[in-house]
Amino acid sequence: MSDTAPRRLRHTACLAALLLSGTASASAFQLEMRTEAQVYQMRAWRDSSPDEPVLLPRRRIVQYLGLNGYELVTGQDVGFESSLRVFADFGLPQGEALKLDGLRSEDADLLYAFVRYGTHGFDFRLGRQTYTDISDILAFDGLRVRYMSPLGLGAEAYAGLWVKGAGFLSSSVYQPDGTRESDARRLAQGDPDADPTLTAPEPLYGARLLLENYKGFSASVGYRKALVEGKTDLERATVEARYGRGRGLNAIAGADLDLLQFKLAQARAQVRWDGEQYAVSGEAMRLQPVYSADSIWYWFATAPRDEARLRVDFYPRGPLRYYVQGVGSLYHTEINSGLQLAKADLVTGSAPTYTVGGSAGASLRRGSLRSALDLTYRYGYGGSQLWADLTAGYGFRDGRFTLDGRLSLAHIADGFNPLLAGNFFGAQLWASQAVTQAARVSLVFEQNVNPYTHYDSKVFFLFDLKASL
């Protein structure tokens, strides 16, 4: 590993030490650390035959460092939260990683790091933070201000730069779909088709009006817009509503409107009745990816999915719990014929674009023993799938040592890929030992057997440390 990633981690640790030394008398701090060693291999099918794939080794070390602080005296008015990830892949030389867009053999990602201040109903957050609503989850570097009155009425506003893979200590996890992280390699080669705007800063701003817990009812109306070099990359309006007071009737509904094309992007509605020994819920959804406006998929062919679910949970007295669920999905292939890029042929007798199925399961918890069995079947668009999943675990010595296992069986008949057909088996074993009250070590083995990739073996070693100062 180069000195870059460890140096960043040392700088973060030094900053944390200064903060601890300066405010320890009136503050509390929580330190969380995880080290992962990952050993497995992936199969590459390009330039190889299905029977003789190229094996790509993965030998990764990943370290997570989380440091949180808050005040003890004044009701946690001031605080900060942070999480840093440092990783190195010893099975991927850095020279090979540079040949692929968005691939890194070693680096550091600042997942989030922000300072928080709250007083008299106001809440301020400054730094890298995540934001979630009905349409998406994103990360941005900037400021969020929120106010909530004693009556439950409030508002929030936020502005900053969208966190993208090409940014400083950034990951591409939360950036819009449908585009590459960067064209730096193509630009260096003088490729005329390279896009320099992929790494351009993307300003983001938005706001929401809020109503919280008025006789069990909460609601919000929001707006968000992002720009790349002055052009709109994303513009959305959202509305959400919730009702619930524990047992009895509970409901949630929301919609996400794409203002750039002025059409419904996401929607969800759920009604649930919670009784003492049972619960019944019905849900309807419209789902599709959140594409960047620079993506060809956004303008050419989107694939929204409409889905309906009906579920019944039964939890009688005793250690057993049961559920049964029915699911139906309708897949849309919306091709923009106005662009004249392609034509959709409607063939009589073609495969249906819907799937139907369901699942059922039971769980058991008695003392230190826990177990669950789930069965799932779906048929229709894309073929059929039958899944059986059994998990079991036991805690020894008051949970200081735990042993968990999982067995999975799937019978798949994929209508698009003939190699995805037959029986697929998987097994996992997770052993975990508490070294101290704050530290725990774990070892995970995974084995998969199937006609597609034949055999896959994976090993993970984890060391977790959690301490309060």
Regions found by a protein language model. Give the residues of each.
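Bacterial N-terminal signal peptides that target proteins for export
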Residues: 2-14
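Bacterial N-terminal signal peptides
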Residues: 13-22
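Gram-negative and organellar
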Residues: 27-469
